[in-house]
Amino acid sequence: MATSAEWHEDYTKMSEEALNFSRAVKSVQEELEAVDWYNQRAQATTDQQLRRILEHNRDEEIEHAIMGLEYLRRTNKAFDEHMRTYLFTEGDITEIEEHATTTPGPAAPSRPKSRG
């Protein structure tokens, strides 16, 4: 059962879509917080085996966060539009924004960044 501390608005007046959106956002926030905690612990420890475990756990949390972001992209037009504009691009991010906001029509096609 939800508590009033979890919602800024009366959740009984919210659609299922809005509730699920909020759930996804909260989940992504929690996963990113866990990523940060595991990363801090991995950086702080001098035990190499523990560091590898913590880095593994951190990377699992990153996977979970990305899954949540993908859900938001699939279910929210604005997330989809902005993710398609900015993710997997190269160059200065603010220039990508400038191009996207000053050029009529769709944003410039994004290219996957090489990891090589």
Regions found by a protein language model. Give the residues of each.
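Iron-associated oxidoreductase/ferritin-like identity signal
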Residues: 1-116
